[in-house]
């Protein structure tokens, strides 16, 4: 099996701010479709799940050069402002599940 050059699979954890859980779930629904509409993410299936503490974990794949282009894309920057109001991005290692050999999360339906 060979990796596809230039594409990057990422796992990111979003810890909702108090009272912002619903906003974060809505952002999770919008996130990758918006990135795809801007040609920044691939069609690789998205996985979204939730940790016991309410943190949302998302797995998606950036298109080649997508990460760099996202940082200057006004549509993405506006979305990231909404994320900043709704959550904090935290290291995966901060989730209690991450200390288990088989980290288990509750799947989210997007």
Residue ranges with predicted function:
Residues 33-46, 61-97:
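An amphipathic, aromatic/His-enriched active-site/gating alpha helix that lines ligand/cofactor pockets
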Residues 98-110:
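Short, low-order "capping/linker" segments at domain edges
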Residues 47-53:
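A short beta-turn/loop motif at secondary-structure boundaries
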Residues 3, 10, 22, 33, ...:
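A structure-centric feature marking long, well-folded core domains of fungal metabolic enzymes
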Residues 7-15, 57-59:
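Active-site-flanking beta-strand signature of metal-NTP-handling nucleotidyl enzymes
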Residues 1-3, 110:
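Basic/polar N-terminal segments that are highly enriched at the extreme N-terminus
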Residues 28, 32:
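Short amphipathic alpha-helical/adjacent loop interface patches that line ligand
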Residues 15-27:
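Short, surface-exposed ligand-recognition loops at beta-strand->loop->(often short) alpha-helix junctions
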């Amino acid at each position: 099996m060979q990796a596809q050059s230039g594409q990057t699979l990422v796992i990111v954890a979003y810890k909702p701010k108090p009272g912002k859980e619903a906003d974060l779930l809505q952002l999770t629904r919008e996130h990758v479709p918006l990135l795809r509409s801007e040609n920044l993410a691939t069609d690789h299936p998205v996985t979204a799940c939730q940790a016991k503490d309410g943190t949302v974990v998302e797995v998606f794949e950036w298109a080649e050069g997508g990460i760099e282009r996202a940082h200057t894309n006004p549509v993405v920057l506006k979305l990231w402002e909404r994320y900043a109001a709704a959550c904090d991005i935290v290291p995966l290692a901060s989730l209690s599940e991450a200390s288990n050999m088989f980290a288990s999360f509750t799947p989210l339906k997007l």
